[in-house]
Design a protein with these regions (language model features):
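Glycine-rich phosphate-binding loops of nucleotide-dependent enzymes
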Residues: 1-169
Length: 169
């Protein structure tokens, strides 16, 4: 966690502290980032995005579903008041309805001014969510630009999605 630089990562695999409650996990995000003072404003930011965290605040984190653990990991990161939120494969292994909820929250956070760096294996979803995108092959950037342009590029669509039409197909 690089909270001093304002960068906080939500790693692949969620990594919640399983024996602690949801509320305790959220507080760890503040402590790790060195945030002082009342947590009320931070909780007011997290709970509307992920109401289940408020409902389950006293539940042991390890008993949450995978989607709920991801929401908790993102909530914990937000408690540290990041300037940049990095997410590694947030959709991995989640049900489509949970993915939709999580990405809706990410879009909202971005609209509120939070910069989000997203590494995502679901290219269609990533390009529908992002403003800008980069396509990497073997650790090298092979395409980059506005996400909408990449999504409509027939070469990228054919190579990465197996069709010559854009992502809308």
């Amino acid at each position: 966690m690089r909270s001093r630089a304002g960068i906080i990562q939500v790693p692949e695999g969620r990594r919640v502290i399983a024996p602690l409650s949801v509320a305790e996990n959220l507080q760890l995000g503040r402590q790790a980032a060195g945030v002082r003072g009342s947590d009320a404003a931070d909780l007011e930011r997290v709970h509307p995005l992920f109401p289940v965290l408020m409902e389950r605040r006293n539940q042991i984190s390890g008993s949450l579903s995978g989607g709920q653990q991801l929401m908790l990991a993102i909530g914990r990161a937000l408690m540290g008041r990041p300037k940049v939120l990095m997410l590694d494969e947030p959709s991995l292994g989640l049900a489509p309805v949970i993915i939709k909820d999580v990405f809706r929250a990410l879009v909202q956070l971005n609209r509120e001014g939070l910069t989000i760096l997203l590494v995502e294996q679901n290219a269609k979803l990533a390009l529908q969510t992002a403003h800008r995108a980069a396509v990497l092959e073997q650790g090298r950037i092979v395409h980059q630009g506005p996400a909408a342009e990449l999504a409509d590029d027939p070469v990228i669509a054919d190579h990465y999605f197996g069709r010559a039409a854009g992502l809308a197909a």
